Structure formats: C-alpha cells, structure tokens
C-alpha cells in the first residue's frame, strides 16, 4: 500500500468539502469533511479511488 494509506485522517483548518480517508485498522474507506488546506495524503476525492488505492 502507498504511504498515504498509513496516515491518520487530517481535516485541515479551512473551508470544508467531502472527501474520503482510509482507516488502516478497519481496512475501509470513510467519508470526512476536508477543509481544503493542510491535512495529509490520506485524502481521496471518491470512495472508489480510496478503495482502489488502499483496501487490501
């Protein structure tokens, strides 16, 4: 799995929009409100992209 899949979710401090993050413990992707700035690479625009990248 890519490094992004190892990171915890980080929403960031600005305006929010929907995105998806990977939970390593659950081996699943979940929606969250991303702020549009800050955060980390564990952020995907769709559930499908998240699952395709990270879910084993």
From Swiss-Prot:
Gene3D superfamilies: Pancreatic trypsin inhibitor Kunitz domain. Residues 5-56 form the BPTI/Kunitz inhibitor domain. Signal peptide: none annotated. The keyword Secreted applies. Disulfide bonds join 5-54, 14-37, 29-50. One of its GO terms (cellular component) is extracellular space. GO terms for molecular function: serine-type endopeptidase inhibitor activity; toxin activity. Exploits its two major loops and engages more positions in its interaction with V2R. The pharmacophore defined by numerous amino acids positioned in loop 1 (9 to 17) and loop 2 (33, 38 and 43) may be at the origin of the absolute selectivity of this protein for V2R. This is Mambaquaretin-9.
């Amino acid at each position: 799995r890519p490094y992004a899949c190892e990171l915890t979710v980080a929403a960031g401090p600005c305006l929010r929009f929907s995105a998806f993050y990977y939970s390593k413990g659950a081996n699943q992707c979940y929606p969250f409100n991303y702020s549009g700035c800050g955060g980390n690479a564990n952020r995907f625009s769709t559930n499908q992209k998240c699952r395709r990248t990270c879910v084993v």
